[in-house]
Amino acid sequence: MTAAASGAESRLCTFYVGDERYGIDILTVREIQRGPVVTPARGAHRAVRGLVNLRGGVVTVLDPAVQLGYGERELGAKTRLVILKTNAELPRVHGTTLETGDDRVGLCVDRIADVHSVEPGGIDPLPLHVRGSGGLISGVIQLQDEMIRVMDPAAMLRLEEGE
């Protein structure tokens, strides 16, 4: 649950996967890195793009494009890695937890958009007939010219076989 859904203002780190804009609660973001060299992780879940070395530590790279049904894509010059906080780094406000343990996880996105402030009640629930996203999308924000799909990073980390 994001702060905006719970009645407090929140901010989202927004980015693009393909031509669609997504956002995650900025409280879950540790940092953003340029698209690094990714070492494949053979035998891992298909949404695991691979591993990267970030300042001497290993980061597992997830590909939200695969999880969202876009399929695999080439990483480009604008590709960025959104590094999520580990459970130990997360503030305990709003009950935010991620199943990272001590492992660092990053999401490879096509490009970063901006930080978007969300007023209380500014996130609409998904319509009933589009809730089949496996819980990856928790709601939408309607802007004048586009929508931001709000991702649940905890759901993204629950990699299940057969997806």
Listing of model-derived features with the role each one plays in the protein:
Residues 1-163:
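An acidic, low-aromatic, low-complexity terminal/linker signal
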